[in-house]
Regions:
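Active-site acidic short loop of glycosyltransferases
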Residues: 8, 33, 78-81
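Cell-envelope/extracellular polymer assembly enzymes that use nucleotide-activated donors
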Residues: 10-12
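Short, well-formed alpha-helical segments that are part of the catalytic scaffolds
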Residues: 14-33
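Acidic helix N-cap motif at the loop->helix transition within catalytic regions
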Residues: 22-25, 46-55, 95-96
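A conserved acidic beta->alpha catalytic loop
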Residues: 30, 41-50, 87
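Short, structured coil segments at secondary-structure junctions
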Residues: 33, 54-55, 134, 157
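Conserved donor nucleotide-binding strand/loop of the catalytic core
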Residues: 49-79
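Catalytic-site signature of metal-activated, phosphate-bearing donor transferases
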Residues: 69-75, 81-82, 86, 93-255, ...
């Protein structure tokens, strides 16, 4: 997809997908101004790829291992030097679009840029619990690579990083069923990451840490000001900490059982 703006370095928007037919059209509409849209799909069985084909001819299939590995494989496939990574449940606002185009026209003085995210939970904006959510998503193709982690990996950037003013919209949960399935996957990956740093799960991992997560988000980050949505988010977040360590305990038990006696 060619942009109407040709007086700036060309940009590839990279979108990883898996069964995102409910989200993908709105996402693609928000980035159709880009010089290239690159969709990297990990085996969708719904209409995701069919819808994506209306916006781009570059739809690549790649087996999914984890988010970081998928994106690290996809980044070098971009045709242009600047890459913007957008998830299917995110939207680039017109203001953010114009800011990115203006930045590329002017000539970026950084190798990458952080973007704030405004998160929505069940359609409701969350202004406190996730207030300081940010991610490095706009960067030079040859300067950025995700850390080798199963989940919540950051980009290791070779060069200075700047900030963009306008946020990315993130619609993180449209149904509890999908949200819980997502958290089930994430806590499994997080347990595998934690296994490298936590040799043994102890009682405080299963009690104190989930409780502190709830206190931190609901009280210190003023999640109570987000109403019922804030309470639910903080409760689910605390539960995800519990599940991460419970799954790590399970992994450690299996290793103990596999040891020769």
């Amino acid at each position: 997809m060619s942009s109407a703006h040709q007086d700036h370095p060309p940009l590839t928007v990279l979108i990883p997908t898996l069964n995102e037919e409910e989200n993908i059209r709105e996402c693609l509409e928000s980035v159709k101004w880009a010089d290239e849209i690159l969709v990297v799909d990990s085996g969708s069985t719904d209409r995701t790829c069919e819808i994506a084909a209306e916006y781009t001819s570059r739809i690549l299939a790649h087996e999914y291992v984890n988010s970081a590995a998928q994106k690290n494989w996809a980044i070098p496939q971009a045709a242009h030097p600047w890459v913007l990574i957008v998830d299917s449940d995110e939207r680039v606002t017109p203001e953010l679009r114009d800011e990115i185009i203006a930045l590329l026209r002017k000539g970026p003085n950084c190798a990458g840029y952080h973007i704030r995210r405004v998160n929505h939970f069940m359609g409701q904006p969350v202004r406190h619990v996730w207030k300081n959510d940010k991610c490095l998503r706009l960067f030079l193709r040859d300067k950025g690579r995700y850390q080798d982690r199963q989940v919540h990996a950051d980009i290791d950037l070779k060069g200075p990083a700047g900030w963009l003013k306008h946020p990315l919209l993130h619609y993180t949960c449209r149904s509890f069923e999908k949200y819980l399935l997502k958290h089930d996957r994430y806590t499994t990956w997080a347990a595998r990451d934690r296994a490298k740093r936590t040799p043994k799960v102890r009682w405080h991992h299963l009690t104190v840490r989930p409780a502190f997560r709830f206190f931190k988000q609901y009280v210190l980050k003023r999640g109570f000001l987000d109403g019922r949505a804030g309470l639910i988010i903080c409760g689910l977040s605390a539960f995800s900490v519990f599940m991460k360590y419970a799954k790590l305990w399970e992994l450690q038990q299996r290793k103990d059982l596999d040891k020769p006696h």
